[in-house]
């Protein structure tokens, strides 16, 4: 079972639908409707922290869920979830120089883990005004994808099964409508 922490974002259910198409049965809780103890009692196979309209500090139990599950279950953060992972492990989330709402960018990646087998570069759809500051990235995290301008679009923990993507794999514009976004989510389910 995939536990989804919903940060009150309309894109969350696009992700849920994609995971359903991949044969997963997501269990969805709003970030103010479940405690860490309740989540641990569910004993999910993996956890996803969803996008959302705020900062990690305003994302309900998202940071606490990362603390509870990192190293115990595979964990994926998308957009706000990605920022929450960066912040939890010691990075700084800052206002982006360019607001990217409904815009696409070419993203280069390492072709490993969640990016395995994806086009490189791939087209990624972005909806964010915050990002993880590259200079603040702690030693335990590594950049797995970035824009030509050096903005972090993917990160991974060096020792734990924790990944984040700043962009939206569920967007139809990601990978120019190709299978890349779905493949990224499928890769997560296999890790």
Regions from the PLM with identified roles:
Residues 82:
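Catalytic nucleophile loop
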Residues 2-4, 11, 28, 33-44, ...:
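Amide-donor transfer/coupling interface in amidating biosynthetic enzymes
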């Amino acid at each position: 079972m995939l536990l989804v922490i919903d940060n009150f974002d309309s894109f969350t259910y696009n992700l849920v639908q994609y995971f359903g198409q991949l044969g997963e049965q997501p269990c969805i809780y709003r970030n103010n409707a479940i405690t860490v103890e309740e989540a641990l009692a569910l004993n999910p196979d993996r956890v996803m922290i969803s996008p959302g309209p705020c900062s990690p500090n305003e994302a309900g139990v998202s940071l606490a869920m990362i603390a509870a599950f990192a190293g115990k279950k595979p964990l994926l953060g998308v957009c706000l979830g990605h920022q929450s992972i960066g912040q939890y492990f010691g990075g700084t989330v800052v206002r982006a120089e360019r607001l990217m709402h409904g815009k696409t960018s070419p993203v280069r990646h390492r072709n490993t883990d969640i990016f395995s087998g994806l086009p490189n570069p791939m087209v990624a759809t972005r909806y964010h005004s915050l990002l993880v500051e590259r200079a603040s990235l702690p030693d335990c995290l590594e950049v797995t994808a970035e824009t030509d301008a050096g903005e972090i679009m993917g990160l991974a923990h060096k020792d734990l099964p924790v990944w984040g993507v700043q962009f939206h794999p569920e967007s139809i514009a990601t990978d120019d409508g190709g299978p890349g976004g779905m493949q990224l989510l499928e890769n997560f389910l296999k890790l």
